[in-house]
Each structure stands twice: as structure tokens, then as C-alpha cells.
Amino acid sequence: MNPPAYPREEQRRNIQGTTVLIVSIDASGGVLDVEVERSSGNRNLDREAVKAARRWRFNPEVRDGKKIASRVRVPVEFKLN
């Protein structure tokens, strides 16, 4: 999974935060939907987290030997050093 881009204005203003996403995954590991479960408190950080998550691939859940669709909670941290 590639991390999201850090918005330049938020970097400049030293804004950090964590966006918690709920990602719906199909049986092949593709992303069906992304929702913000808990905002970072910054719209631009949340937007970049969702944008990145839509490009990710996951290992789907396996139940009774079959890959199935599922949902996962993913925290996305934006932190400056």
C-alpha cells in the first residue's frame, strides 16, 4: 500500500493527524468503497487518505477456503518529522 500524499499546505502549517477509514474489499482484494470513520480534523488530510485507499489492494479474507468480500478499519497517520 502506497502512503497518501501529504498536502503541501498542511505540511507548511505543520498540521498532523490520523484519519480512520473503513475500506470495503471485494473477494479479489480490490477496493469497493472507502468511508471516513473518524476524521483527522482536517478535510485535506481526510481527502488524501481516501484518495490513496481507493488505489490500494488487499489480501481478501478467507472463510471455509474461499475468498470473501469484507470490511477493514485502517488508520492513516499524517505525521511530520
Give short role names for the model-derived ranges:
Residues 1-24, 47-81:
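Short proline/glycine- and basic residue-enriched helix-capping loop/turn segments at helix->loop/beta transitions
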Residues 1-3, 21, 31, 36-45:
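Short glycine/proline-centered loop/turn elements that form peptide/ligand docking sites
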Residues 12, 27-28, 42-43:
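Loop/turn elements at beta-strand to alpha-helix junctions within RNA-recognition modules
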